[in-house]
Amino acid sequence: MIISAASDYRAAAEARLPPFLFHYIDGGAYAEHTLRRNVSDLADIALRQRVLRNMSDLSLSTELFGETLAMPVALAPVGLTGMYARRGEVQAARAAAARGIPFTLSTVSVCPIEEVAPAIDRPMWFQLYVLKDRGFMRNALERAKTAGVTTLVFTVDMPTPGARYRDAHSGMSGPNASLRRMLQAMTHPRWAWDVGLLGKPHDLGNISTYRGSPTGLQDYIGWLAANFDPSISWKDLEWIREFWTGPMVIKGILDPEDARDAVRFGADGIVVSNHGGRQLDGVLSSARALPAIADAVKGELKILADSGIRSGLDVVRMLALGADAVLLGRAFVYALAAGGQAGVENLLTLIEREMRVAMILTGTHSVAEISGDALSRVTREAAVVP
């Protein structure tokens, strides 16, 4: 298969993965309206082409939370990444480090912090959920500090799991799920050998280390379902700050009032995100929500955005709408499933190349220059861009 754009990796991943895994990463909540709008709304953002601007001094690098990034992109936290490629979190982290950007390890990763951090030569980020088991949260924060994690990404849009109907049809959940997954693995021998056999153990490393016993897929589902905490409030940020003094980013912001509260409670950054359309179907796409949030808090903290980003052009669109940087989630997992570390490195090369083209043709010399001026007048008026 020829890979000429990030979108090609989705088809390659679908061919390689058992359906329960492909649809787990590909699907969203309920009827998946928000999932689709994340992509379509971003694609509708029209840029303002400029010419004869002398673009010989173009630069994609940026500063974020005391780090220099080769481009304004980080890999998002994605649970179960180690099921998409052999020791997948390690491969993805190495790819990010090779391209000079951060990798964010999920709370529910297959590979534990202690396996991933030593595998790369730059600090990584760590994502944490608010869970009823505060002992686990303290343990995770202590281990993250010991491993040299620099930035904490605190996910706040999962006080309860979203209703993901596609999972019941694919075999990730629902009747006879274990049997269906086993049969699917048998019909995908390359994945079964490379990941299913050689990629063991398939524990949730960060949780298993704390609990002192292996945590398989069914344990993962049950443990998370029992530990999501609907009592989560802004006061939990104060509790986190007792244990974490480094940069803290609040992930899951869609409303300007919540963004202002994040500033008030001392967050260093936010991620404008609807969890990739995997939580509440029917909410705004990130691209639609971003301009009002940027208008409310731009300059008071760093604004990141995710959900729907599939190209370097999309990165430039998000920056023009008000983001300082973006997180890539599904896009890198597709590439990881299709080609491992090399696939993710190639994806990031494609993203960088597409960003360069978009910046040259919009006349923006640096990441700092990308603003609402890079958007067409029609888009600016429709999006109410600050």
UniProtKB/Swiss-Prot annotation:
Alphabetized InterPro entries for the sequence? Aldolase_TIM, Alpha-hydoxy_acid_DH_FMN, FMN-dep_DH, FMN_HAD, FMN_hydac_DH_AS, LldD
Q: Which reaction does it catalyse?
A: (S)-lactate + A = pyruvate + AH2
What does the UniProt keyword field contain? Answer: Cell inner membrane, Cell membrane, Flavoprotein, FMN, Membrane, Oxidoreductase
Q: Does the keyword Oxidoreductase apply?
A: yes
Q: From the record, give the transmembrane residue ranges.
A: none
Molecular function terms from GO: FMN binding; L-lactate dehydrogenase activity
Report domain FMN hydroxy acid dehydrogenase positions. 1-380
| Record keyword Ribosomal protein present | no
Required co-factors? FMN
Its Enzyme Commission number(s) read 1.1.-.-
One cellular component term (GO) for this entry is: plasma membrane
Q: Which GO terms describe its biological process?
A: aerobic respiration; lactate metabolic process
Question: SUPFAM superfamilies given for it?
Answer: FMN-linked oxidoreductases
Q: Per UniProt, where does FMN bind?
A: 106, 127, 155, 251, 306-330
Superkingdom of origin: Bacteria
Q: Which CDD domains match?
A: alpha_hydroxyacid_oxid_FMN
**Task of the protein:** Catalyzes the conversion of L-lactate to pyruvate. Is coupled to the respiratory chain.
Protein name per its UniProtKB record: L-lactate dehydrogenase
Q: Provide the taxonomic classification.
A: Bacteria, Pseudomonadati, Pseudomonadota, Gammaproteobacteria, Lysobacterales
